[in-house]
Amino acid sequence: MSRVGKMPITIPAGVDVSIKEDQISVKGTGGTLNLARNPLVKVVSNDGKLNFEPANESREANAMSGTIRQLVNNMVVGVTKGFEKKLNLVGVGYKAAASNNKLNLQVGYSHPVNIDMPQGITVATATPTEIVIKGADRQRVGQIAAEIRAVRPPEPYKGKGIRYSDEKIVIKETKKK
């Protein structure tokens, strides 16, 4: 068995996990998340803990047990605490404004860039150069953050652009004459 797949998930109070034939649902204060069930993994619930076991001895089933376990763990953490990504805007005149699930970016183009947030994702701007994306689904939060970053990725000569708050940009040396 995979090392990740062996570890049980403790279900905190206030979280309801339902295991059906075709999907696993996790319901909590942060919302409801669903995951399609894989036939290679057996899910066993007992005493407030979830255990994941490979359905057979194949290598694929072993790997999938760890993957499904981590996805369900992310769902449990998402509906209890939630996930967030922080982005910073670096550049003269670069600013962001959030209102009514829309993000307005002014990042050096001749027009502002408007991005609509999907259901379950909230966006806030603490300062005009900081963007905070929050939600229960870790994958969707990361995907939206990547899409916002792709509007103006950091360039390697001056470092201007949209970057993750913990991202380090290696600045290149300019061409010598």
UniProtKB/Swiss-Prot annotation:
GO terms for molecular function: rRNA binding; structural constituent of ribosome. This is Large ribosomal subunit protein uL6. The keyword Ribosomal protein applies. This protein binds to the 23S rRNA, and is important in its secondary structure. It is located near the subunit interface in the base of the L7/L12 stalk, and near the tRNA binding site of the peptidyltransferase center. Belongs to the universal ribosomal protein uL6 family. The gene is rplF. Part of the 50S ribosomal subunit. PROSITE patterns: RIBOSOMAL_L6_1. Keywords: Ribonucleoprotein, Ribosomal protein, RNA-binding, rRNA-binding. It comes from Variovorax paradoxus (strain S110). The keyword RNA-binding applies. SUPFAM superfamilies: Ribosomal protein L6. Gene3D superfamilies: Ribosomal protein L6, alpha-beta domain. NCBIfam families: L6_bact (TIGR03654). GO terms for biological process: cytoplasmic translation. One of its GO terms (cellular component) is cytosolic large ribosomal subunit.
